């Protein structure tokens, strides 16, 4: 490896470039760390001024940045300038108080600082021996959170189950489906994999279908059971029973059911207790996906949404969605940890150690797809300690209150309608001045197209950002409160902007028709 001569160093210093032979010099770390914290504090203070959805065109960054990496070091000051001028314009600002799209990414000071500590320790926490504190803290915080959710004891370490922090719900579903697959194939033979069937609804997140593909489930054996408006688009147990019965009669093997508490499109809630009963008849693995709404269930008034979870095999929710824990942090609990371990464990010689052989420790590498893993428990622990249960509940309630406010504003305008019941902090609505409940054919197409155009015009301004869904054939706008910085004033401003653009679009269409 070559070295820089004194002339080169002098030239670098003269040009103001940062240079240090130690890439982790404590004093330089302190200096630059303060600069980055100040940069982010200013960003949070001013994020409301930025267009929420990035206004750049595809390929914009390639036109700005050099074609190759710099040969010599550049100062952090220079890099931060480039971030301000080139990167920030290309960010869709999920932390903006005017962000109402998808579901929120509700970061917090505690979540950020926990992530900072985790990154600073840079521990690779694949088994207990590789970082005992990381493993043991994870077992503790998942039990803490399981108790907050009033999960049955059998999901906690204290009751023979246990929790693990995955990256996302996609990983949680894939891990549990793999465990379910191997458990069944060990009974009926591995050559029978083509008979295994996976069940969700037509509202279930696409992660289920992706997991089924990866797990080797035949594409023809994936069932998206139809939902109906009469059930608020939640999965009905009797509809599931019909589909499962037909599969059994055809000689197929029901494997895995994924009910959802808070679907992505409309926050619909599947009927857990009845669905678990159907699954039990066929010895299916039931994984409850509460990625978004699980956070709300720490509040007693929302806990009923997961009634029936005692009949499930596993349960997960994303703390990085609505629990003030910075991305990524999916909390997964299983009743049978050994099923995960049997499907996912590897024990090469170089990982063998006395702690593992004692069988007194948890090795989380055997609860996930990858070997290496991050110290995710640190940020979740800090969030729960820094805010406390009472404040966490009140934060969640404040977001629900803002959603109720928006729901009331929509209902008061006769041109708009609420499309499905609001369960949590997301409102599905659309422009429909005729208020015909079941418009069909060309009329439905016109209403859908108007709402599509309205959403795009609102989003293109950068004043706020929403996303859409198609529910029962109806194109709807989704307004999800929950961004950490959002206040009631932002909700009211967003509604005024929507009304203004609806009126302008109506005028534009009317003018075009007249001429």
From Swiss-Prot:
Residues that coordinate or bind pyridoxal 5'-phosphate: 169-170, 264, 318
The protein, known as: Tyrosine decarboxylase 1
Sequence repeats: 81-138, 141-192
Reaction(s) catalysed (UniProt annotation): L-tyrosine + H(+) = tyramine + CO2
2 X approximate tandem repeats: annotated span: 81-192
Keywords: Alkaloid metabolism, Decarboxylase, Lyase, Pyridoxal phosphate, Repeat
Cofactor dependence: pyridoxal 5'-phosphate
UniProt: substrate binding residues: 105, 205
One of the record's GO cellular component terms: cytoplasm
Modification sites for N6-(pyridoxal phosphate)lysine: 321
Residues in the signal sequence: none
Coiled-coil boundaries: none
EC number: 4.1.1.25
Catalytic class of the enzyme: lyase
Domain of life the protein comes from: Eukaryota
Disulphide connectivity of cysteines: none
Any one Gene Ontology BP term: alkaloid metabolic process
Tissue expression per record: Mostly expressed in bulbs, and, to a lower extent, in stems, roots, leaves and flowers.
Annotated family: Belongs to the group II decarboxylase family.
Role of this protein: Catalyzes the decarboxylation of L-tyrosine to tyramine, which is converted to norbelladine, a precursor to all Amaryllidaceae alkaloids such as galanthamine, lycorine and haemanthamine, and including haemanthamine- and crinamine-type alkaloids, promising anticancer agents.
CDD domains: DOPA_deC_like (cd06450)
InterPro entries the record matches: Aromatic_deC (IPR010977), PyrdxlP-dep_de-COase (IPR002129), PyrdxlP-dep_Trfase (IPR015424), PyrdxlP-dep_Trfase_major (IPR015421), PyrdxlP-dep_Trfase_small (IPR015422), Pyridoxal-P_BS (IPR021115)
Pathway the protein contributes to: Alkaloid biosynthesis
One GO MF term: pyridoxal phosphate binding
